[in-house]
């Protein structure tokens, strides 16, 4: 391997490291972010049927996240689960028509009423997304 090849390998490694760091460390979903400051310890429970699963960016500058539209009685509720990369890491497979029970809190984000999930029960899975203090579990994976 000559010096030119070593330089290319070095630059590629640095760029890859910066890209991974930028996607996970400061994606707007972390504890202390503007978004997570919306989370309240006043936990409610929501149950219903998933109408739609989509990707959304809750606030400007955030990484994409997973969002559900859940029919709960006569209401349709927007539920924000977690960053997209976390759902991919967990191989999360939530589909329309799935029955769900979600614990979390109500919040207003960009003028829209949302439900920020802390625990999801669907099909045969129970997924804890935040601890008792509202700290996202994905912060432990960074």
Description of each model-found segment:
Residues 24-45:
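Short boundary/loop segments of OB/S1/cold-shock single-stranded nucleic-acid-binding domains
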Residues 42-62:
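Structural detector for short beta-strands of small beta-barrel domains
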Residues 59-81:
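OB-fold (S1/OB) nucleic-acid-binding surfaces
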Residues 86-102:
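Short nucleic-acid-contacting surface segments enriched for D/E, G, S/T with interspersed K/R
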């Amino acid at each position: 391997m000559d010096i030119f090849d070593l330089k290319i390998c070095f630059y590629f490694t640095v760029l890859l490291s910066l890209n991974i760091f930028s996607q996970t460390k400061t994606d707007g979903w972390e504890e202390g972010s503007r978004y997570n400051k919306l989370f309240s310890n006043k936990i409610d429970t929501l149950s219903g049927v998933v109408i739609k699963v989509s990707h959304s960016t809750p606030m400007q500058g955030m990484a994409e996240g997973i969002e559900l539209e859940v029919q709960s009685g006569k209401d349709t509720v927007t539920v924000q689960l977690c960053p997209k990369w976390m759902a991919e890491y967990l191989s999360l497979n939530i589909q329309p028509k799935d029955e769900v029970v979600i614990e979390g809190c109500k919040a207003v984000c960009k003028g829209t009423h949302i439900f920020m999930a802390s625990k999801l029960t669907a099909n045969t899975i129970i997924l804890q997304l935040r601890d008792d203090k509202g700290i996202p579990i994905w912060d432990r994976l960074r």
